């Protein structure tokens, strides 16, 4: 069931919620996160939302967690957050990165991730999910059946929305920045990824997601008299610090993606 959050708990009135910074897919990249936070602070927003996939990665899981707890953003759970706290001994045996993450995090961040909501109705206008309303693994906007990202048809997107009618839908998961109108009443925004600009995956079939530059990505959405305005940002950061930690943990594929915005072969 979709969780509804009261605007009073976020220290603003609902009619003041007009300018929202949207983050997703930080993936333990503290250095990218810090650059994005500094950029947001220079622009000014009413609230920051974090769409999940927060701590999975070979960079700085615990330090990223501690920084986010200081920042106290509105946050939902992503599929790889769930996979961390559900990880079994067999998962760790076949995935050394998962074992590193669990060792680095300790128990407190696992408890925090477990209490994060699957999705969130921020107010009557704005709905948050990590991937799609019914499944944290299914890309809402992107069709990867050909091995790379293409825009889904409006019919497919409507089916995946499962009746969710909020005027603004904020989603992540694909790491691919998108701004998509559905009919005349809905706008879907994917801010892209803060922490990882390319990857390969084998579900639901083998595919790559690539942004072709290393910049950390996020978005700001603003409600104006004419409707929602969207600004997508690409932020430079100290990539080499993240690369060094990925290489230290044996993840040359991550190092290549961090530097290039392309998936390794």
Name every feature range the model reports, one short phrase each.
Residues 181-265:
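Acidic, His/Gly-rich catalytic cores of divalent-metal-dependent hydrolytic chemistry
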Residues 12-21, 121-127, 183-186, 227-228:
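Beta-strand-turn-beta hairpins that frame and shape the catalytic cleft
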């Amino acid at each position: 069931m979709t969780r509804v959050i009261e605007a009073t708990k976020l220290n603003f009135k609902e009619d003041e919620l007009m300018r929202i910074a949207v983050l997703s897919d930080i993936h333990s990249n503290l250095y990218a996160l810090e650059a994005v936070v500094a950029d947001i602070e220079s622009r000014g927003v009413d609230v920051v939302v974090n769409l999940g996939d927060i701590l999975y990665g070979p960079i700085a899981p615990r330090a990223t967690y501690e920084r986010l707890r200081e920042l106290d953003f509105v946050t939902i759970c992503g599929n790889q957050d769930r996979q961390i706290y559900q990880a079994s001994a067999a998962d760790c045996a076949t995935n050394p990165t998962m074992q590193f993450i669990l060792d680095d995090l300790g128990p407190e961040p696992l408890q925090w991730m477990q209490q994060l909501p699957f999705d969130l109705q921020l107010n009557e206008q704005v709905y948050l999910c990590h991937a799609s309303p019914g499944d944290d693994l299914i890309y809402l906007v992107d069709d990867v059946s050909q091995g790379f990202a293409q825009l889904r048809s409006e019919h497919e997107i409507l089916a995946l929305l499962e009746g969710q009618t909020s005027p603004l839908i904020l989603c992540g998961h694909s790491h691919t920045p998108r701004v998509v109108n559905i009919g005349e009443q809905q706008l879907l925004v994917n801010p892209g990824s803060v922490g990882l600009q390319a990857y390969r995956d084998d579900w639901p079939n083998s595919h790559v997601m690539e942004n072709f530059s290393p910049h950390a990505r996020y978005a700001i959405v603003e409600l104006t008299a004419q409707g929602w305005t969207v600004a997508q940002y690409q932020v430079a950061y100290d990539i080499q610090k993240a690369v060094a930690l990925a290489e230290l943990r044996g993840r040359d594929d991550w190092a290549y993606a961090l530097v290039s915005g392309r998936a390794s072969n």
